[in-house]
Amino acid sequence: MRHSAPGTLRVGMGQMRVDGGRAAVNLARAQQMVLEAGKAQCDVVVLPECLDLGWMHPSARTDAERIPGERTTVLGHAAATAGLWVVAGLTERTDTAVYNSAVLLNPQGELTLLHRKVNELAVARNVYTAGTAIEVSRTSFGTVGLPICADNFEDCHFISDAMADLGANVLLSPCAWAVTSEQDRNQEPYGSLWERSYAILAKRHGVAVVGVSNVGYMDAGAWQGRLCIGASLAVNPAGQVVGRGPYGCEAENLITVDLPLQTRTSRARGADTG
């Protein structure tokens, strides 16, 4: 159900807490964030990367689930109750691999797009297999791509470039942004890497870009001891920052932003995507 004016997308940036390995607790938080976004009249809510088990948590090897599956069903029910689109990062199991995946669910709770992270960091490749496909999905508000976190690194822009070439006019990115416990925010402000990367993509293609990170403590895995700090980010098609989440390990928050969207033409198919 659309709530915003034509040409504008109201996005809920669901900067939720994620506790490593606690799928039931995390899914309950995600459901609540979806319902809050519905009350805030959002068209879509974006949730973090690997929100079920936490990014790089060792439980991924044993507790990842199939997509579609029970976890997408839970989130789908929340989407249908709230009447909005949901983007969520989930840990996916297939017969042969575990993937760091993102899903797009429509307001009826149906799965409409699955993306498997292509640019998985070297430190996480013993947990996740890299994805090999790039797709987009046409929705009631435009055409969506789901790059996951480092898929939007500046040296890997080919991933989101391809999504834009397929007609995407908005990139909705589940993320897990973490820092060491020693990082001094005043000496080393967080976020410039993402601001630059998102602005380049936005201005190159006329796309809006939204990245949503979780908050919380990483209690296991290769980055044990690091802090996920939110600082979620929204950039308009002109490359300007129009939304930002609070910074901090405890900074759980729903941030709403009204994003202008541009009508674009798919280079691959020659079709309007606005």
Give the positions of each predicted feature.
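A cross-domain feature marking catalytic cores of carbohydrate-active enzymes
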Residues: 49, 90, 148, 175, ...
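Cys-nucleophile CN-hydrolase/nitrilase-fold catalytic domain and related Cys-dependent amidase chemistry
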Residues: 23, 27-108, 112-114, 178-208
